[in-house]
Amino acid sequence: MDSNTITSFQVDCYLWHIRKLLSMRDMCDAPFDDRLRRDQKALKGRGSTLGLDLRVATMEGKKIVEDILESETDENLKIAIASSPAPRYIMDMSIEEISREWYMLMPRQKVTGGLMVKMDQAIMGKRIILKANFSVLFDQLETLVSLRAFTEDGAIVAVISPIPSMPGHSTEDVKNAIGILIGGLEWNDNSIRASENIQRFAWGIRDEDGGPPLPPKQKRYMARRIESEV
């Protein structure tokens, strides 16, 4: 096993512990808590894959961080902070919407690029809007927290979410997952539109009528793919 992989995991465990302490002291906001829960699942998955104990890894990570801080100067910290852009958190969904339970009559699912796409293939002839919570860096979607598809009456019919045990995803992974979701739902004559935030930060476009940011050929391709691969 690569030593850098172990070191990275140990440091991630300790930094998660620090963030957890902040949450326990009510010193953080809702997006912070969202990322904390998501990262906890990811660390458990990585720990299982690597065969490492989380408690031991956290203690080793503490030693590594303390060694770095002892040799770090205030000037170096100022330079690092100034040169590193901070991601923004975009929320289409409320806490209630992102945590609401949902059920599928005809479940279909597919894994793509570290993301799980789940949808109810029993949904037909509905108007559906896609909403997502995600972070943005350099004016582009960086990390997806959750994407959900809602009918006009608020029912959830599809979800895209990161797989905790997998090592992350790219903007292209998110776009591909959305394409699969749109293709699968449109197969049953549903009308799909994406939120302005999804269109702007995933595809870099603004569509005033809220239509799905995919050309017809790509949507047909995704529809065929969902039928053949799911």
From Swiss-Prot:
What InterPro entries does UniProt report for this protein, alphabetically? NS1, NS1A, NS1A_effect_dom-like_sf, uS15_NS1_RNA-bd_sf
Region annotated RNA-binding and homodimerization sits at 1-73
Q: Quick one: where is this thing mainly located?
A: host cell
Concerning Gene3D superfamilies, the annotation shows: Influenza virus non-structural protein, effector domain, S15/NS1, RNA-binding
How would you describe the post-translational modification of this protein?
A: Upon interferon induction, ISGylated via host HERC5; this results in the impairment of NS1 interaction with RNA targets due to its inability to form homodimers and to interact with host EIF2AK2/PKR.
Any one GO CC term of this protein is:
host cell cytoplasm
Renumbered ranges of motif Nuclear localization signal = 34-38
List cystine links.
Answer: none
Q: Where in the cell is it found?
A: Host nucleus; Host cytoplasm
Please name the Pfam families in this protein's record. Answer: Flu_NS1
Q: What does this protein do?
A: Inhibits post-transcriptional processing of cellular pre-mRNA, by binding and inhibiting two cellular proteins that are required for the 3'-end processing of cellular pre-mRNAs: the 30 kDa cleavage and polyadenylation specificity factor/CPSF4 and the poly(A)-binding protein 2/PABPN1. In turn, unprocessed 3' end pre-mRNAs accumulate in the host nucleus and are no longer exported to the cytoplasm. Cellular protein synthesis is thereby shut off very early after virus infection.
Reproduce the free-text note on domains from the UniProt record: The dsRNA-binding region is required for suppression of RNA silencing.
Q: What is this protein called?
A: Non-structural protein 1
- Species: Influenza A virus (strain A/Chicken/Germany/n/1949 H10N7)
